[in-house]
């Protein structure tokens, strides 16, 4: 068996093309373009690349992109003040603060300062709580993108045994909630999990997000499983690999995401979807 590739890059481009059409229709109807504020603190190389991708994506679909590049020594108080300013700006529908932040700034305090109706990353406790209560509005971007990738396979998720490896607030925990919503029986694995191999082997659907290259052996994959590899790791030779042994896993899985070109493009596409959703649901003047 050789797995079918789930082409996140192509699916994300389709989403972006649809968004571009919707934005053009908004403007033709006399409405403004959605606005996204992107805040970067410091000069972390990986974050700069990722933020740059988000800004270019905004411009591609016709959004207004507002960029705030702050010095790494920016105080927490100054960052919170900037968020307050963006919260009050009616031309801004979404606020994104690129994580991780410098150690002297409290991530949780920053996330909670963003108004829930402008929290297009979907990290605010209000939005996570809505997802937990099965009434989601703005949903965490990476899990939302993963759900779109899973749907593209045509596989019915109801009743699937799903295993999530990694329990971060950004991916693992909200991913568990999304898969529960999708009718899966879910197992979430973390640093204290025993018998990880056994839990992976039983998974009809596997999502891995730990940031360790080749952490999941290909031979563990259940025949025909859907494998979603969220990890993106740069090796010493400069190549990018995921958290799953791709070549070996491809011999067992039914569907698998590549790295790069799988989950990453979907995260940005869903950020744009959330921003348009916020504009239409919360901020349009009727």
From Swiss-Prot:
<keyword id="KW-0560">Oxidoreductase</keyword>
<dbReference type="InterPro" id="IPR046346">
    <property type="entry name" value="Aminoacid_DH-like_N_sf"/>
</dbReference>
<keyword id="KW-0028">Amino-acid biosynthesis</keyword>
<dbReference type="Pfam" id="PF00763">
    <property type="entry name" value="THF_DHG_CYH"/>
</dbReference>
<keyword id="KW-0486">Methionine biosynthesis</keyword>
<keyword id="KW-0511">Multifunctional enzyme</keyword>
<dbReference type="InterPro" id="IPR020631">
    <property type="entry name" value="THF_DH/CycHdrlase_NAD-bd_dom"/>
</dbReference>
<dbReference type="GO" id="GO:0004488">
    <property type="term" value="F:methylenetetrahydrofolate dehydrogenase (NADP+) activity"/>
</dbReference>
<dbReference type="GO" id="GO:0000105">
    <property type="term" value="P:L-histidine biosynthetic process"/>
</dbReference>
<keyword id="KW-0554">One-carbon metabolism</keyword>
<keyword id="KW-0378">Hydrolase</keyword>
<protein>
    <recommendedName>
        <fullName>Bifunctional protein FolD</fullName>
        <ecNumber>1.5.1.5</ecNumber>
        <ecNumber>3.5.4.9</ecNumber>
    </recommendedName>
</protein>
<feature type="binding site">
    <location>
        <position position="232"/>
    </location>
    <ligand>
        <name>NADP(+)</name>
    </ligand>
</feature>
<dbReference type="InterPro" id="IPR020867">
    <property type="entry name" value="THF_DH/CycHdrlase_CS"/>
</dbReference>
<feature type="binding site">
    <location>
        <begin position="166"/>
        <end position="168"/>
    </location>
    <ligand>
        <name>NADP(+)</name>
    </ligand>
</feature>
<keyword id="KW-0368">Histidine biosynthesis</keyword>
<keyword id="KW-0658">Purine biosynthesis</keyword>
<dbReference type="GO" id="GO:0006164">
    <property type="term" value="P:purine nucleotide biosynthetic process"/>
</dbReference>
<comment type="subunit">
    <text>Homodimer.</text>
</comment>
<keyword id="KW-0521">NADP</keyword>
<dbReference type="InterPro" id="IPR036291">
    <property type="entry name" value="NAD(P)-bd_dom_sf"/>
</dbReference>
<comment type="pathway">
    <text>One-carbon metabolism; tetrahydrofolate interconversion.</text>
</comment>
<dbReference type="GO" id="GO:0009086">
    <property type="term" value="P:methionine biosynthetic process"/>
</dbReference>
<comment type="function">
    <text>Catalyzes the oxidation of 5,10-methylenetetrahydrofolate to 5,10-methenyltetrahydrofolate and then the hydrolysis of 5,10-methenyltetrahydrofolate to 10-formyltetrahydrofolate.</text>
</comment>
<dbReference type="GO" id="GO:0005829">
    <property type="term" value="C:cytosol"/>
</dbReference>
<dbReference type="Pfam" id="PF02882">
    <property type="entry name" value="THF_DHG_CYH_C"/>
</dbReference>
<dbReference type="InterPro" id="IPR000672">
    <property type="entry name" value="THF_DH/CycHdrlase"/>
</dbReference>
<dbReference type="InterPro" id="IPR020630">
    <property type="entry name" value="THF_DH/CycHdrlase_cat_dom"/>
</dbReference>
<dbReference type="GO" id="GO:0004477">
    <property type="term" value="F:methenyltetrahydrofolate cyclohydrolase activity"/>
</dbReference>
<dbReference type="GO" id="GO:0035999">
    <property type="term" value="P:tetrahydrofolate interconversion"/>
</dbReference>
<comment type="similarity">
    <text>Belongs to the tetrahydrofolate dehydrogenase/cyclohydrolase family.</text>
</comment>
